[in-house]
């Protein structure tokens, strides 16, 4: 006889009737699934003395193992069974408990912020508890339940004890963010804001980044997904940057490091008293700082480091991530962003040389690189002609070929087009230039190096993210409401969170920069009858992202009318009366595939912004959504899926995830490796960039088997790089190569794709 150990420690014989009842409940109302298949799959794992929790895990695993392109609905079965386990683990029963008593209990445990009981009365908490919809737990797919249990639900990360369920998470996040909302502000009461925010998040219209999902409602208050830190060219400045990195990595943030100011190897120090050791030793120092903390058990530390392509050490910097070389001349655990501008591309196209300098030797050149392209070119030519300045001249095609080879071989050498970042950005580069991006290449905010650790005159940029789930929108008009809650919540978060450094707090509260993007674009295209490669869907993309930018600006203007414009609004192009529709890359207008009429009432909005200003300096950025897309059961960000079923590899094991509405849309989806090239995808990225005031985590993808000798020609890589630049794309993120990774004997790679875990902004950034 097999005996089962109950939660209270007592034992009882395995009840076949109870066992089958749970299985039947798991499949009830779900089409094209078999209760007997789930029961039989789990039966092989049953053993004498197993706990009820282990028994339930066996049922979940059995259902999850049955997920396939032919039987995608087992994802719902596995999700339902796993959600049952989550709620039993959290509450000891399936039903949600009293919301008030739940909060009191978790505040006393020290896992919830005690302000919840200070800012809300018992009656208000009871009202919000009644508003919670436990049935919305049924909306989660299996991958979502795994992520919730491992990453997002508040828990003891040593014992694994879970303290809450998903609907409480969504309500509590809203309660924390709007605890200081004044009744009547922007025409809404505080409880209306909390309830409205709960509705748009718990129904997946708005996707939240990992730091907010995992952290808001806990005593830890740092939720910006990514942090941008620029290093000064001095020992004190480098030390200050390193200190800031450690501070923020320990608070769940990914890091963007700007080190382009650092002088090159062999430069004089103190008028020749010493010789500079070059950039690489300091990059190793930054790498150690990044890897010093594990981000509270939620994410591993990660950073992208930025430098200009004309830096004197560029030939050594480009190869830092590859597997050749020795430990002394490699810094492999950082990613890299190579910053390029118009003149560098022109030298490439004209088959000319690029001259490399140490920034310290060419006064004004580094700053002009971002602020004024004409001034940069004049200074660059002047310094090229000055024989007294140390320099090196290399063929542009050789330098760019090395760049693209390293990008292809590592996948994680990124591109930042700094002229586009500043000319088609939210800020006036003369007063607030953008010097770098972030970990995942979607954030373009001003930074200023810290001269010393507590330098309040420095500027550390923080990006605060969320994403619209395009698949949940029945019409573009719905964006108005969702955009308002998104902007209001993220704006409130800027005041709610703590800041370890004045150099972050002062600009964060003065600029109030936000980055709202989208997830589920692949599903959105498919359900509307379009795909990535066909330009027929370009007009839909144009109309959708025009509406997104418009409604976000509208929401920020409404908040500015109610609360006041952000303090440094004058440093934006918006303050000069300019909108994204005024300064985008005009090459888009020359192509009928990318030139479409505007549909929104922009001039009326321009007038309101002129009158009230904006609450936020930036509103949009397109981040990766690998993790949060699993929560909302959506395709990742703007990316094409790799197959109808993705096998997500994480620290908690393998999880299968089916694309939305696969049965109905299986012939409409265009999968990553079915795209003939990058042109259709990059064109849609360019259309999105037309409206977005920050940048886009855009990837390039290559299948070597499409080319002679199974090798992607260098000319193809350079063509795509130039095409992206010509279309106004600000940044390029991953370079993905199809190499058969994850292929198993029983899997067709076109159907099942293995997605490896990544260091990430998580997004949020990845969100």
Model-derived features: positions:
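Alpha-helix capping and helix-loop boundary segments enriched in small/acidic/polar residues
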Residues: 7-14, 161-164, 184-192, 212-218, ...
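Core nucleic-acid recognition elements
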Residues: 10, 33-171, 175, 188-198
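Function-dense linear segments that define catalytic or interfacial modules
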Residues: 154, 161, 168-186, 190, ...
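Internal maturation/activation junctions in enzymes
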Residues: 200, 218, 483-505, 531-625, ...
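Polar, glycine-rich mid-to-C-terminal structural blocks
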Residues: 319, 328, 332-403, 407-410, ...
